[in-house]
Amino acid sequence: MKVCPSCQRAYQDDSLNYCLEDGTPLERLRSSSEDQTRLFSPDAAPTLRHVPPVTVNERPQTRYAKSGDINIAYQVLGDGPVDIVYVPGWVSHLEYGWESPLVANFYRRLASFSRLIVFDKRGTGLSDQTSDLPTLEQRMDDVRAVMEAADSARAVVLGMSEGGNMSLLFAATYPERTIALITFDVFAKREWDPEYPWAPTPAQRQGFYDAIEKEWGGPIGIEDIAPSLAHEQSVRDWWGTYQRRSASPRAALALARMNTLIDVRSVLPAIRVPTLVLHRTDDRDVNIEEGRYIAARIPGARFVELPGSDHLVYAGDQESIFREIESFISNLRHAPETESVLATVLFVELAGPHTATESAPDAGRLLSLAKRETEWFKGRTSKAANGFLATFDGPVRAVRCALSIRDGALRAGIETKSALHTGLCNIEADETSGAAVDVSVAMVALAQPGEVLASSSVKDLVSGSGLRFEDRGVHDLDNALGQWRLSVVKGDLN
């Protein structure tokens, strides 16, 4: 892998010697033991982009990126040596956010040492409204679409609150696009669990839903998310208007319900990029233990506890946040390209006993069908000694591909069984290896003919997709692969 020392654009093609953006000679990334130089020097040259730079004293123009058939509103501010993609929380509105001096200061301070890219998630603010609930997978696609529209090959991803969940998943799935990951007051799960006791109980979440239905348009939740500002009428008025402009009551309620289903705990060990976890000590909305939990499970993550009780990143003491972020980014060092990525592995095999002679025709037809469906669902086919193996960067696409392969094979008179698991993989050319492959292969032995089995790592990441599951309990795959809760995919409501 090579990188431009001027604009930091990364290139996988080792045959390239000069940057396609500005003609600067490319440098090969070396391991940290070989190269201890900082990735971004204080006097690094400004990045040359197709998007015109906007000074920190201006309000940036709102532009649109195309993510599938959805338009995602985004803005670019500043022209620093590193891109930062800011992923907002629950709801947002790009242009009305600037009406708050606190939000404006937050954006401008970040843009003083970076090129800041901000956007409204699909279904909120100035981005297209959608009839279906957005999945984390679709929201990851939106981040990629915005980065591509802004000519950003790699960026530091900064996620706030609910935006941190998709940031965690993005960093694990696309380490080649993620220079580093920063989270602020983020949770890994949004509903109480014996192994995650800090999250709100179902009754507490229901109380929040009731407040949205009855009080949307007022400053809902400001006493918990910004207690230091809750007494200021101007802030209360701005927050109420900001919420109204960000989402309708129905959309806000649907997004809140979807957030309750979020569970990214299984993703954390798969993150392989430099990570900074920031959390305020007395955050009333997301307990500080949730930040500690996340940091403890991301290899090499740095946890910083900040004083204060405000959940909103732009409320309370902003300067302590900027100091930590700027110091973290300025001390990033060149790192070797990671070989491991988070992916959803699909393994399919013929069901029932067959001799080699009997199964050969069916195996050939299954392989042809599976390859075609995998391409349609944007997956990647890999070699497999027995059966069919494919990987996907999105679990929803993987599940729907598995259902499509099963149904297509059945129409052809071929019975199959399949298994899906999301985890770390090593993907090289047409070969895939790693624990995620081993787990999916072991799982398929537990599937009945015609079944598609999914591990909890898949089920937890597809909230809002309309996919239905039936629990099959916890199974001990073997001593090396551990125990996994498995479910049968029962269908798709969409």
In which residue ranges do the predicted regions lie?
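Flexible "cap/lid" loop of the alpha/beta hydrolase fold
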Residues: 168, 172, 177-212
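Catalytic NTP-binding/metal-coordinating core of nucleotidyl cyclase/transferase enzymes
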Residues: 335-404, 408
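Catalytic beta-strand-to-alpha-helix segment of the class III nucleotidyl cyclase homology domain
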Residues: 389-493
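Conserved acidic catalytic loop of the alpha/beta-hydrolase fold
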Residues: 137-155
